[in-house]
Amino acid sequence: MADLQVVASSHFLAIIYARFRMSARLAVESMAARAAARLSRLAGAGGGTTIPGKLLWKLDPGAIDALAARLPQGAAVVSATNGKTTTTAMVAEILGERRLAWNSSGANLVSGIASTLLAARDAELGLLEVDEGALPEVLRRVRPRALLLANLFRDQLDRYGELEHIAERWRACVAALPPATALLVNGDDPQVGDLGRDRAATIPFGLDDPRHSRAEIQHAADSRYCVVCGRPYEFLAAYVGHLGDYRCNSCGHSRPDLLVAAREIELRGLDGASFELVTPNGTTAVRLPLPGLYNVYNAVGAAALAQALGASLADIRAGLERFGAAFGRFERIPVGGKSILVLLVKNPAGANEVIRTLEDSGAPALLLIALNDAIADGKDVSWIWDVDLEPLLAGAERVIASGDRAAELALRCTYGGLAEDAVEVQPELERALDRGLALTPPGGELVVLPTYTAMLALRRIVVERGFVRPYWERS
């Protein structure tokens, strides 16, 4: 008996010692990574949103698991091709007073997630925007209590491969989720809406207002064919790209019933949108400060996730109505008596919706478009030929083409009907910005359409000039 007690005591002490060693190791690794973040900021290399996470990942990939496990209320994860930064920011606004581990800078790869968890020492809840390609690794390590999958569009084919490849990886992710994990899916996306069909804890969301359907599905739409039998879908309503109300007349596969939806949508150009938000907990009218149908999608997804995390309908409405744009996404920047309106474009579906929103407000006479081909943009820029630029160019008097691929962008504009002498090619973004502002009258607004890395470069310029604070200080 005494021997058994000795063995039990030894085993208990071994567990305590192992946990102490693990905790001590994590503490040392965390100190090193936080020091890297401070050095990054002091050196002007950014906000320390990825470097600490890269270091922590190299030192110990399991540290992410340990940091996530410390969150008292667990974590929620948001992934999508388009809108994940805005949707996550909306959820943060709705949750308001909760202490969040939130990657508000948009650093959404594994390194950014690690940096976020490392920096949020007293956080209650993780709120993590995750790159669609990084989702499997993040889910394995964070084990969220709620997962929002908002859409899949063709984007960065050189990096991700075909859309179906990402969809299959997501399907495997969903199959591995614990039954208690809340799954929220955009029911209007055929690839995404089907992911939760066999799960009890699935909440489909979407739009329910055929008045805003396009006359026909866009030629650049990505999911035209039934995910079950491969036959073409019939779209009863097509809202944004391939998002809409669909059914297969061959096998009967169709959009799932929406549990959270936007109805009675009214678009007010660049001034925003209003809609009736329908949820299992009731219905409320929402006046959204952001424009465009795709921001209504973002808002409905955010509402669905916030409700799954315990937010009241009143909190959801209040949060959405006071929401300001995420950086680079319909962000207005005052510049000495003028302003810059920044609208991120990165793939055909997103760019077409930006153009649609600008059209509704009257296409601007002056545009600055910046096209880069860095890894984060996608090396293959052939997607610009799938964008319906023509309606925007029809109202333009001058376009300044900038970025790494300014020459190809200028060619696309001339093929779109703009006279050659109406296109100025200025690859250097700072000079292009100065030229655009010089052509903008006092009190006027310069509309800038940048790809992702061009948007970051633009922000560096306006930060250096003192027009805005760095995004990591705004967070």
Spans of model-derived segments:
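General beta-strand structural signal in soluble alpha/beta enzymes
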Residues: L100-S105, L128, L184-N186, P204-F205, ...
